[in-house]
Amino acid sequence: MSKHSLQLVECPRDAMQGLPYLIPTQKKIDYFNALLQVGFHTLDFGSFVSKKAVPQLADTAEVLTGLHRGESNTKLLVIVAAVKGALEAVSYQPVDVLGYPFSVSPTFQLKNTRQTLADSLDTVSQIKEACHDAQKDLVVYLSMSFGNPYGDEYNRKIVLDQIESQLRLGIKIIALADTVGHATPKQVYELTSSVIQTFPEAQFGLHLHGEKSNWQEKVKAGYEAGCNRFDGALGGFGGCPFTGSERVGNLDTFDLFSWFDQQHLETGINKSHILNCAKMATQLFA
C-alpha cells in the first residue's frame, strides 16, 4: 500500500445535529477544545443554518467565543445552507472553512436545503464569492454521491457532471458523501478513482457512513483509489436527519485512526488525546 499524507476530519456537528436532546453549550465547548488538541486536519463543529431546522446547533456563534486553539493547526469548519448563513459565518475570524451540501439527488437537495439543483448551484457561486472576499475556504459535500433511496436517476456521468459544474465555480475541495450508507467497497473504489483521475486539479475527500461490520473495506477501497481525506465522528454517532430514511451513523474516527496506524500511515493524530476524546464522546452522546 503506497503512502500519501492523510487528512482526518472530525465531524461532531454531524454526530450532534440529529440528537433528540440539546447538549449544553459549555459541554460542547469543552469537548471541541479537547478535539482541537488531537491533531485533526479539520474540525466540523457547527453550522449557520435555520435554528428551527437544527436547534442543536443554534449556539454555534456562542460556542465559537469559547474555543481556544492554542498551538493547534486544526481548521475550523461550519456548514451553511444559504447565502445568509454564509455571510454570517465568514464574519467570524476563527472560522477557516465553510461547507455546503450539494446533492446529486434533486429530491434530497429539496429536502435538505429547499432548493432545486439549479438554484443551489447559484447559491454555491455566491457563497464562493463570500469566501473569497473573506479569505476562507469552501468545501462542497456532494451528497448522495453513491446513489439515493428516492428513485432519482443516478449514474457516474451525473456525478462527474455535477463535479464539473462545481469546479467551474472555483471549488477546489469536494467530499463524496455516502449519505445513507449504501455504498459498496466496489462503488467507493470505482467512483473515487474515476473522479481523481478525471479532475486532478481538485482534492477529493470521502464522507462515508456505515456500520461497524462494513466500514473497513470501504475505507480501504477509498484509500487505494487515491483518497487522502476522510471524515468521521468519534463513537460513530450521527447520520443525516433529513434523508427521510433510516439514519446510518458516521464512521468512528478512532477506528479510522487505528486502521491507518496499523498500516503505518501518518495521520498527525496524538493517540492519548484521541483516546481521551473518545471517552468524552461516549459520555456526551450517552
What are these regions (language model features)?
Residues 1-286:
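Catalytic cores and adjacent flexible loops of soluble metabolic enzymes
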